């Protein structure tokens, strides 16, 4: 709006209708199959949200870790390299970007969502899906179920920004609402795992660098509060290093 005696100049940019249309088509959500929804920035894959149950047939049927849902994988770097892993042999239960706790207390009983043996996350409904010239967004409602009884409402919101020359920002917002009874969440004692987690894809161990606010580190740092942590390596034989923080 016009201002009287403005103290500074303002600049505006006008775009043709065709340019605006091209920007609006920057992102695209596409169904991969009946369990997975993928996001592309133009022709570059960005990530996949697995809303249905993903099953690894190579894991014995008696092992409850052979199936999981409600997580993000793969996540691609800016050069097409895959940054995340799923069903790694050393920890079958790890799955891309996920959120889980080894100690979930309900009605005096403890469940392990980290290993998902007596409690699991399941898709309930879509809340929102959109694309735009700057970012794309997705919102979904899941449930935590003990057998067939839902004990928790889980709402996941993703906002994925268009890539810059050397980075991409992905915002993840998580909300939990107990259905009836109080629920307690606790991580693993003396090990620090539990909560929002990312399982990185295999990279060059010799070239892997972990950086925290105090600088580079080679320590595990259990039970250490960190505002952020960065892992950088050369994934899958890529020509250059990349990573995430």
PLM regions: where:
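Low-complexity, Gly/Pro
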Residues: 1-20, 126-131, 160-166, 173-180, ...
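Alpha-mannosidase-like glycoside hydrolase catalytic domains involved in N-glycan trimming
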Residues: 1-26, 49-141
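Acidic, contiguous internal or C-terminal segments within carbohydrate-active enzymes
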Residues: 26-32, 130-132, 136-189
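A short, structured loop/turn motif at beta-sheet edges
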Residues: 5, 42-44, 128-136, 163-166, ...
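Active-site/ligand-binding surface loops and adjacent short beta/alpha elements
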Residues: 182, 188-245
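Acidic (Asp/Glu-rich), glycine- and aromatic
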Residues: 49-55, 60-74, 163-211
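Residues within well-ordered beta-strands of beta-sheet-rich folds
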Residues: 11-15, 40, 139-141, 171-177, ...
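Mature N-terminal segment immediately following signal peptide/propeptide cleavage
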Residues: 33-50
């Amino acid at each position: 709006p016009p201002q009287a005696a403005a103290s500074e100049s303002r600049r505006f940019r006008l775009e043709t209708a065709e340019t605006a249309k091209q920007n609006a088509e920057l992102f695209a959500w596409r169904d991969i199959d009946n369990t997975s929804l993928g996001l592309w920035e133009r022709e570059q894959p960005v990530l996949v949200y697995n809303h249905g149950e993903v099953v690894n047939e190579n894991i014995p049927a008696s092992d409850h870790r052979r199936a999981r849902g409600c997580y993000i994988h793969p996540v691609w770097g800016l050069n097409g390299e895959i940054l995340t892993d799923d069903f790694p042999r050393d920890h079958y239960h790890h799955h891309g970007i996920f959120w889980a706790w080894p100690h979930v207390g309900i009605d005096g009983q403890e469940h392990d969502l980290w290993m998902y043996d007596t409690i699991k996350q399941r898709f309930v409904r879509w809340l929102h899906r959109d694309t735009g010239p700057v970012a794309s967004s997705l919102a979904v409602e899941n449930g935590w179920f003990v057998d067939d009884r839902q004990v928790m409402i889980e709402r996941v919101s993703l906002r994925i920004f268009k890539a810059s020359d050397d980075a991409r920002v992905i915002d993840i917002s998580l909300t939990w609402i107990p259905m009836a009874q109080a629920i307690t969440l606790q991580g693993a004692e003396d090990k620090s795992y539990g909560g929002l987690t990312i399982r990185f894809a295999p990279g060059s161990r010799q070239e892997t660098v972990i950086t925290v606010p105090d600088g580079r580190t080679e320590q595990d740092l259990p039970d250490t509060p960190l505002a952020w942590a960065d892992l950088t390596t050369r994934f899958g034989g890529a020509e250059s290093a990349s990573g995430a923080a």
